[in-house]
Amino acid sequence: MKIVLLDAKTLDNDKRLDSLKDLGEFISYDSTPSELVYERCKDADIIVTNKVVFDAPLLKQLPKLKLIAITATGTNIIDLEAAKELNIAVKNVAGYSTKSVAQHTLTMALILLSQIPYYDAYCKSGAWARSDIFTHLSGGLGQMEGKKWGIIGMGEIGREVARIASCMGAEVSYTSISGNIQNLPYTHLPLEDLLKQSDIISIHSPLTPQTHNLINETNLPLLKKDALLINSGRGGIVNEEALAKHLKEGRIYFGADVLEVEPMKEGHVFLDTSLHARLLLTPHIAWAYENSRKVLIDKVIANIKEFLQS
């Protein structure tokens, strides 16, 4: 049984993955460019990957392949119809990062509300040491209590964000792009109304034809002045060029853990330093807090063991 891990670096080369050696011949690669995928997979019985794409033509060239174990929730990297026709099982891991992504979302909102980067830079610049008073309030300080928090996408993560935000005194509402209006203790609003009314908006939807470019040059002007927009869902939901224009005009704040193209490309509009006072970026890490990553890896290993035993 040959098991090939194609992108161990996406899991920080976690040593827990070494237990796959107990299940067969195990080969691990830090990353795998598209031109090397076939060569590395042609003799594999099981492939473990996070981001490597397997389309129908590639799958048809891998007659030994029995299982693709995805180290993530999304299965969009696999042509699922082709895999089914070829009798290749596909297993993912759902729900492992709910707490992690919710924590990251709240962290981003609190950092922006409290203007932490401004005050941190103020202190480290030596300005506080030169001050004639004990405090400095010029950066502004927003408080969560009483804020209206709008959630786009009320799945497990959206509900966890709603729970925590409510505990901090925010008034939560949500919109459902899929039309799935749930029996929840929060007000459901159409998207336009949510954008108009919310002080903080967080995105937790998957990227679908319905959600692609959902937040764009047409509806961004609906946001309140100085509203916070947080995207910890998927890149591509927010039109980045349009968003940058509103940042440059000083209208809103934006926090993002995901971008349409990852890693971020050189020359990206968000690298414009004139935007940075209203922009907070992290490199797609919300899913990967310590406990969540452990749950993910344990479940990937369990998925492979269950498959081998079936």
PLM regions: where:
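N-terminal glycine-/charge-rich "phosphate-binding" loop or analogous flexible N-terminal tail
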Residues: M1-A44
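Short beta->alpha connector loops at strand-helix junctions that form conserved
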Residues: D30, T71-A72, I88-K99
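An anion/phosphate-binding loop that grips the pyrophosphate of nucleotide cofactors and donors
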Residues: A44, L62, Q197-S198, D226
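Rossmann-fold NAD(P) dinucleotide-binding segment
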Residues: V53-L65, Q210-L229
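Phosphate-binding beta-alpha-beta segment of Rossmann-like dinucleotide-binding domains, i.e.
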Residues: L86, A94-K148
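Rossmann-like dinucleotide/phosphate-binding beta-alpha-beta segment
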Residues: T135-K225
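Rossmann-like dinucleotide-binding domain for NAD(H)/NADP(H)
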Residues: D226-L228, S232-S310
